[in-house]
Design a protein with these regions (language model features):
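Short gly/ser-rich loop at a beta-strand->alpha-helix junction or flexible surface loop bordering the NTP-binding
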Residues: 37, 43-52, 62-123
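Short coil/loop linkers at secondary-structure junctions
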Residues: 28-29, 87, 190
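Short beta-edge/loop segments at beta->alpha junctions of small alpha/beta modules
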Residues: 1-72, 108
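Structural motif detector for alpha-helix initiation sites
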Residues: 3, 18, 77, 141-142
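A residue-level signal for beta-strand positions that form part of recognition/binding surfaces
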Residues: 15, 111, 163
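Hydrophobic alpha-helical interaction segments
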Residues: 125-205
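Hydrophobic/aromatic-lined pockets within catalytic cores
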Residues: 26, 85, 150-154
Length: 205
């Protein structure tokens, strides 16, 4: 297949799956992927998923790929907590929550991890846009914190919560108007209620 024709069809999406390609071009030869990978036109994201090489410098492109190559999912936990200033460490791994099974991928755009939750816990996120309007699902800081504590059972003592070094000012901000309590209630988890109670005790919010 002519690469220029292929690029014109898919480049606006920055990445694509083999399923999408076959739907658009039923007689597509998968051998083209090897050729285009060898020429540096595209990069492999994961099995049957590829991205165009020239989008690498697009701000936020990793955020976008995180949601595209494993869906449904949304960015959450440490990645969003760091971005919101809730934890002091910078986080280079794209951490997401999904209703699919737990998974992880590594490619030229970064490391991507996905933690599995029940479908009914897939809430508390909104859509942001990067590049030329590419959509990204991102948890609110309150939901990111709750996802993190729900999925990491070791944070169950005052000492462990204190070791997170959460920013008290950011915590206070996300606790306003009962936003944090509302998220906690939707989980229906006694363990999460207990951990958030410890957070409030340690950071006096």
């Amino acid at each position: 297949m002519n690469y220029i024709t292929f690029r014109e069809r898919f480049h606006d999406f920055a990445c694509f799956s083999n399923e999408q390609v076959v739907a658009a071009f039923p007689r597509f030869d998968r051998g083209n992927y090897s050729t285009w990978l060898g020429k540096g036109y595209i990069k492999r994201l994961r099995r049957s998923w590829y991205a165009f090489d020239d989008v690498a410098g697009t701000p936020g492109i990793g955020d976008y790929f995180a949601g595209r190559m494993y869906s449904p999912s949304y960015l959450s936990c440490e990645y969003v907590m760091a971005r919101a200033g809730l934890i002091p460490e910078s986080v280079v791994q794209f951490t997401s929550v999904t209703s699919l099974k737990t998974a992880s991928f590594k490619n030229d755009f970064g490391e991507f991890s996905y933690r599995s939750v029940k479908p009914e816990l897939m809430f508390g996120y909104g859509v942001e846009h990067v590049g030329d309007g590419l959509p990204v699902n991102v948890a609110t800081p309150a939901k990111a914190l709750c996802d993190f504590l729900y999925l990491n059972s070791q944070y169950d003592t005052l000492e462990e919560i204190e070791a997170l070094r959460l920013d008290a000012d950011v915590l206070e901000e996300i606790s306003r108007d009962s936003a944090l309590d509302g998220v906690v209630a939707r989980f229906g988890s006694r363990a999460l209620v207990r951990r958030i109670k410890l957070v409030k005790e340690v950071y006096a919010i």
